[in-house]
From Swiss-Prot:
GO terms for cellular component: cytosolic large ribosomal subunit. This is Large ribosomal subunit protein uL18. Part of the 50S ribosomal subunit; part of the 5S rRNA/L5/L18/L25 subcomplex. Contacts the 5S and 23S rRNAs. Belongs to the universal ribosomal protein uL18 family. This is one of the proteins that bind and probably mediate the attachment of the 5S RNA into the large ribosomal subunit, where it forms part of the central protuberance. One of its GO terms (biological process) is translation. Gene3D superfamilies: 3.30.420.100. Pfam families: Ribosomal_L18p. Keywords: Ribonucleoprotein, Ribosomal protein, RNA-binding, rRNA-binding.
Length: 120
């Protein structure tokens, strides 16, 4: 029987393979969430480089929200990543939820990024 971790890793791999199939050269918005923080980065897979990144650990996020790991912090990270991406000229991305269920903090980050000007 597979462990929960093995299932999670396989789900993430399945998700990334599917994303690469439909990406068509668009960078991907990758999300990682730990128990206390949430991180997002936009990665250009063609060059293998991170274009922009944001997390709930940054000073900009902690000044506005304080330390936190709730959906409000995720919304703030979504707004930050969208603002930075638009500055860099990135508007169309593919959302890589990294095997996480599209619910809670991941959903809050995605919706805030959409409101900030990212299309996915």
């Amino acid at each position: 029987m597979k462990t929960q971790r093995e299932k999670s890793v396989r789900r993430a791999q399945r998700n990334r393979i599917r994303l690469r199939k439909f990406a068509n050269g668009r960078p991907r918005l990758s999300v990682y969430r730990s128990s206390k923080n949430i991180y997002a980065q936009i990665i250009d897979d063609a060059s293998g480089k991170t274009v922009v990144a944001a997390s709930s650990l940054e000073e900009a996020a902690q000044k506005e929200h304080g330390k936190g790991w709730d959906t409000k912090a995720a919304e703030l990270v979504g707004k930050l990543i969208a603002e930075r991406a638009v500055k860099e000229g990135v508007k169309d991305v593919v959302f890589d939820r990294g095997g996480y269920i599209f619910h809670g903090r991941v959903k809050a980050l995605a919706e805030a990024a959409r409101e900030g000007g990212l299309n996915f």
